[in-house]
Structure formats: C-alpha cells, structure tokens
C-alpha cells in the first residue's frame, strides 16, 4: 500500500518525517509512506504558497500509484485551496482514503460533499510529537492499512452515518460552499486552545446553521488546553454543548473519544459498514 503525504496547511520537518517512516517500517512494513517535498516548504505561516499546496495535494490525489492521502498536520490554510482542489480532482482521486483532522476538516468536508473518496477524521503524522504519539500514528496506520475496527471511535455503530470536526473549523465551514449535508449523521466535535466564551460562541454559530439539518445527534470530544480567562465562565464545555443542543433541538448523545491528543480515534465520514 502506498500512502502519499502532503501539507495543505502548515509545514513539517524532515526529522519528524523520518521518525514516522521508521515507525511505519517496523509496525506496518506493507505500507510505503511517501512524504512529498512540499511538506517541508516554509513560506511565512504556510507550507508553501497556496499554489504550491494546491498542486501537491491535487497531484497526489490524482496519482493512481497512491492508495491513500494522509494530511501531515493542521494549523491553518486548507480552506484557501479546498474549492480549487475539488475542481481539479480526477477519477483516481475517487478511490482513495483521505485521513486527517483539525484544519484538514476543510478538505474532508469538501471531499465528502463532492462524493470523492472516503474522508476520515483521525491521527496525522504530526501526532508523533505528542506524548504517546507512536500509538496515535500506529492507530492511523492500522486503519489505513488494515481497516482495523479497534482504531474506530468506540461509539460508532455499523449502519449509521458519522462526521467529525474541530468545532472552530466547523464554525468557519457552515454557510460556505465546502459544507456537506449532515442529515441523519451523528456529528462529533472537539476543540483545543480556545477560551470557553469562544467555544460557546462557536457552538451558537454552528447550532444556528445546523438546527434544521436533521442531525441524528451530537457527541462532544475532548476540549483541551483551555486558556484561563480573567473571570470564570460559569459553565463547563459539556454544559455549553448540552445547553445549545437543547436550545436548537439537537440530540446530545454524550462524549466522543476524539481530540487534539494522542488518544484521538478514527471517525470515517458517512455510512459505516
């Protein structure tokens, strides 16, 4: 199995790429990981210009030699190329799995809306930098290479539809041409490094857009590294989620085992068989 790796948002390092390749060679020798050189370009905030990031993703996605595309990390930048990318994808792109999370939710959403390939929320190569990161990378490879059900978020049930996003990313997606139809889907959301008031505001925005979308329900993943505000907010992240779900008539289904951490689980978009 050949897995192409690109950076639609921010850059990676060759040293960390070598660590991922070495780990994969030990745990999944049947997988050939190919880090595109674009992953290592640094141009201001981004892994190269918009044109360079777009070209790398489209080239790998359209290359029949690759079975899957693995996004190297998040950050910011994927929304700047997503619409153009979808317009340039050809037949070979339709048979691939696309794996990532965080800012890559922009591309996962766009791919899912366009019916191209199989978008999947899950760990990325950058997670090797975390404590327990080897397990996160191996979990992703177990899914990509073997379709291992143990990699899946534990609440996933066959015969149901799912989607998973970082909440702030989703808040920027709703109301745009990238946003897919989530009718009859269980939506899972997580967040990192946001004040609780910003988390609350994002939930308001997402809920207003999705209150009539026919969601099957919502699960809340981990909300981590919350900055300390100058005064207590007065609600936990779960209480915020429950309040907005109640207000908008969305079934709150409890916790989800996803987040910006090494325990992040795999959530395929769409119908899980």
Placement of each model-derived feature along the sequence:
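Conserved anion/nucleotide-ligand pocket segment
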Residues: 116-175
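Short internal beta-strands
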Residues: 34-37, 100, 215-222
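Internal helical hairpin/lid segments
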Residues: 178-230, 237
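Short, acidic/small-residue loops that bind anionic groups at enzyme active sites
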Residues: 87-110, 118-124, 247-253
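Conserved beta-alpha junction segments in alpha/beta enzyme cores
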Residues: 12, 16-17, 161-194
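N-terminal glycine-rich "phosphate-gripper" loop used for MgATP/nucleotide binding
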Residues: 68-83, 101
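ATP/NTP phosphate-donor binding region
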Residues: 1-65
């Amino acid at each position: 199995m050949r897995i192409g790796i690109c950076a639609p948002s921010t850059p990676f390092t060759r040293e960390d790429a070598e660590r991922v390749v070495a780990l994969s060679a030990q745990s999944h020798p049947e997988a050939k990981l190919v880090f595109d050189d674009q992953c290592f370009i640094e141009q201001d905030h981004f892994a190269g210009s918009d044109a360079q990031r777009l070209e790398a993703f489209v080239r790998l996605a359209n290359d029949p030699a690759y079975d899957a595309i693995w996004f190297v990390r998040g950050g910011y930048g994927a929304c700047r190329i997503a619409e153009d990318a979808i317009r340039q994808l050809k037949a070979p792109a339709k048979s691939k799995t696309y794996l990532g999370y965080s800012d890559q939710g922009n591309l996962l959403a766009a791919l899912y809306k366009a019916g191209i390939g199989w978008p999947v929320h899950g760990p990325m190569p950058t997670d090797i930098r975390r404590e327990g990161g080897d397990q996160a990378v191996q979990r992703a490879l177990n899914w990509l290479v073997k379709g291992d059900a143990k990699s899946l978020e534990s609440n996933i049930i066959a015969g149901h539809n799912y989607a998973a996003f970082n909440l702030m990313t989703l808040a920027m997606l709703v109301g745009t041409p990238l946003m897919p139809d989530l009718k009859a889907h269980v939506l899972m959301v997580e967040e990192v490094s946001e004040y609780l008031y910003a988390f609350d505001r994002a939930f308001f925005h997402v809920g207003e857009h999705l209150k009539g979308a026919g969601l099957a329900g919502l699960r809340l993943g981990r909300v981590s590294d919350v900055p300390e505000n100058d005064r207590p907010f007065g609600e936990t992240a779960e209480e915020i989620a429950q309040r907005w779900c109640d207000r908008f008539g969305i079934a709150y289904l409890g916790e989800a085992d996803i987040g910006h951490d090494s325990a992040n689980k795999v959530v395929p978009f769409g119908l899980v068989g």
